Amino acid sequence: MLSTIFGSVCSIDLKIDADDNKKFAFLRKDKKGEKCPIFSDGEDINGTATISLKPGKKFEHYGIKLELIGQINILNDKANSYDFFSISKDLEPPGFLVESKQFKWKFSAVDKQHESYFGTNVQLRYFVRLNIIKGYSGNIQKEIDFIVQNLCIPPEINNTIKMEVGIEDCLHIEFEYDKSKYHLKDVVVGKVYFLLVRIKIKHMELDIIKMETSGVGKNYTTETVTLSKFEIMDGSPIKSECIPVRLYLSGFDLTPTYKNIQNKFSVKYYINLIIVDEEERRYFKKQEIFLWRKKMG
């Protein structure tokens, strides 16, 4: 429960109800702080709002309102805060509070088509805000966050990825991944086949790369982060050698692929195959993969 004290007159508390089966997740990327309940598209959200008055005190206001908001913040553009979703309920008409009050509230079948996201330059957050309207003296507000995750239907078509790449007369390889769409706890299975090897290879690695694009115009930014470096071969291979690939995605901090969310941001993922020779030259081939959510949490 969250609480804020306003002077010596009153304090307010805001709580989202969650049953014993409700899953929770950290709001922050560093997995610190409090965990928040996870909801999905169309699910009801309910809770309580409490205004506690000190004995003998009264409190004038111009209405008490509860709002449920979906908001996108572009962190490198402080002016670019966008509420893509908002619904509100009036809890109390203008007047005086002369005693403490508790309000039970509920938002039914809430449309939550976008997932919560906390990236490098973008935040998509959902929260409930208690708003006590005070006129010229400034409103009193309290917010509490919750997380939205949405399950996906397994893709009907999931083709393998197969490519031949190389450097003329020096290196020619064929690589294959078992599919192009993976759930967040999936395993990437594949192989790398060396058709021609005329350079001395030091090692080969497989990287998972996340690319976040956000903003428009002069505020458009692209952030690329390498989430993992997984060595799959040490030493130089011979012609016709086949190197197996098995990469477990569950060990990485991944989200589903997000495409042009509210025309504000996108998140894509890539598998990057990198070969390093003995002179530290790097040869790579990047291939996009599609990620989707199979389970909550």
From Swiss-Prot:
Q: Which domain of life is it from?
A: Eukaryota
InterPro entries in UniProt:
Arrestin-like_C, Vps26-related
Q: Which UniProt keywords apply?
A: Protein transport, Transport
KW Protein transport (keyword) present: yes
Kindly list the biological process annotations in GO that this record carries. Answer: intracellular protein transport; retrograde transport, endosome to Golgi
GO annotation, cellular component aspect: cytosol; endosome; retromer complex
Q: Give the family this protein belongs to, as stated in its UniProt record.
A: Belongs to the VPS26 family.
Q: How does it assemble?
A: Component of the retromer complex, composed of VPS26, VPS29 and VPS35. As part of the retromer complex, interacts with the sorting receptor SORTLR/sortilin. Interacts with GTPase RAB7.
Q: What does this protein do?
A: Plays a role in vesicular protein sorting. Component of the membrane-associated retromer complex which is essential in endosome-to-Golgi retrograde transport.
Stored PANTHER family:
VACUOLAR PROTEIN SORTING 26 RELATED (PTHR12233)
What name does the UniProt record give this protein? Vacuolar protein sorting-associated protein 26
Cite the source lineage: Eukaryota, Sar, Alveolata, Apicomplexa, Aconoidasida
